[in-house]
């Protein structure tokens, strides 16, 4: 199964989702992380890292790994508009890469100047989203960071210690403004 937190987006027709019981939700995620680290399957340890990212998101922290939406993944809404992800909000920015109904050849959209402009906007996107569709590809791409965390915390779990939920920002060359709402809004 996959875990998620509330996100606001045009696609969800929501822009007012708020977690009112943050402490309770984060405590539940912390318990889930402890259970996942006790598993014998490495995939569970990486899910624990992902869930730590959800805690970070709920607490309003800076996105731990960069977002590469529009390069690693995309989203097509029901009317054919192609976006880098489904978590865009008008209050920050929202620009489509193209429309699959108007331009039936997807590669024409994907390789277009407009798509590149959107990717440039993603590089500076202030949202700190942490959704499986955008977090998983960068967890694979920059695997040394989640791997180091997973191994260290699996060892802690085996010693009967709690996970270290450091929630640090991993600098992998991304724009320092990306994923940090605190700097702009």
Where do the language-model regions lie?
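Radical SAM enzyme [4Fe-4S]-AdoMet core and its adjacent flexible, acidic
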Residues: 1-69, 73, 77-78, 82-83, ...
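Flexible mid-to-C-terminal extensions adjoining Fe-S/redox cofactors in radical SAM and related proteins
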Residues: 81-82, 86-185
